[in-house]
Amino acid sequence: MSTNEGSLWGGRFADGPADALAALSKSTHFDWVLAPYDIAASKAHARVLFSAGLLTEDQRDGLLAGLDSLASDVADGSFAPLVTDEDVHGALERGLIDRVGAELGGRLRAGRSRNDQVATLFRAWLRDAIRRVADGVLGVVSALATQAAAHPTAIMPGKTHLQSAQPVLLAHHLLAHAHPLLRDVERLADFDKRAAVSPYGAGALAGSSLGLDPDAIAAELGFDSAADNSIDATAARDFAAEAAFVLAMIGVDLSRLAEDIILWSTTEFGYVTLHDAWSTGSSIMPQKKNPDIAELARGKSGRLIGNLTGLLATLKAQPLAYNRDLQEDKEPVFDSVAQLELLLPAVAGLVSTLRFDVDRMAELAPLGYTLATDVAEWLVRRGVPFRVAHEAAGAAVRAAEARGVGLEDLEDAELTGIHPELTGDVREVLTVEGSVNSRDARGGTAPVQVAKQLNVVRDTADRLRLALRR
């Protein structure tokens, strides 16, 4: 009789565990999401046991039928963990034994440990999860691309240090948020190559002596290969840390987009109006329309960063191989996935319904002497060294500021007084449209270049969607 009913160990113990230990050890409140993966792995394990001569055909078929019944009951909620179940593995073994009996159900545990089980299930769950997250990220990219396509010629103030710098196209700025998100999806796709290695068959750490075939289980579960080193297979969680990093990076990239939207929606900027369905009000101030989605995106990025750093701290000092510390590996990653699955559709909805005040942005685009660089580059095209041209353009700004006028309002004599090459012809470039159109090198803000960037974003998104469906 086991001293620890509902768990997968106990024969060596005469008593226990203490209630406080049982409560501390319990993980079914978070690892139950692995149940479908556990059952799929158990079915593959039954087939491998049969191939190794450790099960008869009838025993294999009986286990598979019991596992199918258990899977159905898990799916509809009629089977769930009990308070006495330590983890998802023990709960499901209990469920299987209830269906096929202790003699047959007990045979399935041969040749496997919770150590290789959980490492495999975590990888399998995470491979599916990152595809869902990637799809959500691509939804935000699609919203950004749609807005960019809808505003192909709208000009806005480009900023550095949050100070007006140079005029840029709104579409150019929006696509600048799309590119890092696409890189995040590329990271998720690349991550899958390292996650697609199955630890199954590694046992507790030393491998199996029962003639089992780890490659067969790996293939059945959709992995690319089995692990090369059984100790590493059970102990490694760098795949979890890598995923947590990419999830945190997505949070950071969303936070930067959110910060722009928060600023743009203020009265002081006035670039955008938020859609009623994607904003909230105040309990006391009737006039308020608050960018809550953007603010929550900004806040959740800190949570995702915390999940990453917490996981790394858990991993940093563990000796090989498996240690119980690794029970703490899943909740941070599960939470990061859950937060992004909640956040991404909301951000996509927010972005897709933004209403831009293009007249307001165009009005602000030249303010702050944002065409000063155009003056300097105009002089360079006339043979003036850039260092000298930069000084001359700065002097022109100083003169215009002193008079409270724009650069285009300086008199010809004032211009040539600053530099003999700085003639009234410079006014040809002192328009925001001329400034934007002139920046037509690859990646620049000229409409022809931004149209190419839009095509790149859409083509890359389509390619990544296909890659993630494989």
Swiss-Prot record:
Family as reported in the entry's similarity comment: Belongs to the lyase 1 family. Argininosuccinate lyase subfamily.
One of the GO BP terms on file: L-arginine biosynthetic process
Localization, UniProt: Cytoplasm
Cellular component GO terms, alphabetical: cytosol
Pathways involved: Amino-acid biosynthesis; L-arginine biosynthesis; L-arginine from L-ornithine and carbamoyl phosphate: step 3/3
Annotated organism of origin: Mycobacterium sp. (strain JLS)
Catalytic function, reaction form: 2-(N(omega)-L-arginino)succinate = fumarate + L-arginine
Listed EC numbers: 4.3.2.1
CDD domains for the chain: Argininosuccinate_lyase
GO molecular function, one term: argininosuccinate lyase activity
Broad enzyme group: lyase
Keywords, in A-Z order: Amino-acid biosynthesis, Arginine biosynthesis, Cytoplasm, Lyase
Protein name stated in the entry: Argininosuccinate lyase
InterPro entries according to UniProt: Arg_succ_lyase_C (IPR029419), Argininosuccinate_lyase (IPR009049), Fumarase/histidase_N (IPR024083), Fumarate_lyase_CS (IPR020557), Fumarate_lyase_fam (IPR000362), Fumarate_lyase_N (IPR022761), L-Aspartase-like (IPR008948)
Chain's gene name: argH
